[in-house]
């Protein structure tokens, strides 16, 4: 009987230690996830501070997919537009993530003219393939470079642009933290598109 009690006690101690190890591991994973989330939020806060209220040049020229020159002021409406900025050199998965997020939120002809895609693609054919594959309905323009510091990060980003060419709500989505992108687009939709 004493041996059975000893074996039972040992098994209980082993099970308790395994449970503690699993709980500790779960806690560590949650801590890493929380740290990552804080880092993404902190980076977007900094990006917003550095890039909000930048003013684009009113003489800026963009090109449609047929290489027709269009003045930026010609494509803006009297209401703020959501600009989706991406480049061929950006992480392809990140670009797709951003475009798919935008396409899910806005699907109205009324709003489609206020959502503009600004792409930097030396290979126009690659851009056309991307647009066709994702069945993008928004106007797409070729833009080499914009005069805001966000251009240097080499990730796709988005912002609101008003008729005075002033940027606001600059945001860089992170494919590993989709809930932040969801919140951003819900807030933008509620404020500007309803």
Task: State what each model feature region is.
Residues 160-194:
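Thiol-/selenol-based redox modules, centered on thioredoxin-like
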Residues 128-161:
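Short, internal strand/loop/helix patches
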């Amino acid at each position: 009987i004493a041996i059975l009690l000893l074996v039972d006690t040992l098994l209980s101690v082993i099970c308790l230690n395994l449970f503690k190890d699993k709980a500790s591991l779960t806690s560590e994973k949650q801590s890493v996830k929380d740290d990552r989330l804080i880092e993404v939020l902190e980076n977007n806060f900094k990006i917003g501070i550095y890039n909000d209220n930048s003013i684009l040049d009113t003489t800026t020229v963009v090109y449609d997919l047929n290489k027709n020159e269009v003045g930026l002021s010609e494509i803006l409406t009297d209401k703020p537009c959501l600009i989706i900025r991406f480049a061929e050199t950006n992480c392809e998965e990140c670009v797709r993530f951003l475009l798919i997020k935008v396409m899910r939120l806005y699907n109205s002809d009324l709003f489609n003219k206020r959502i503009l895609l600004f792409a930097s693609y030396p290979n126009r054919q690659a851009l056309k393939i991307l647009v066709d594959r994702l069945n993008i309905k928004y106007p797409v323009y070729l833009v080499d470079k914009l005069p805001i510091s966000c251009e240097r990060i080499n990730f796709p980003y988005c912002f609101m642009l008003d008729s005075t060419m002033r940027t606001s709500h600059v945001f860089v989505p992170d494919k590993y933290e989709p809930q932040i992108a969801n919140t951003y687009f819900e807030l933008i939709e509620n404020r500007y598109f309803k």
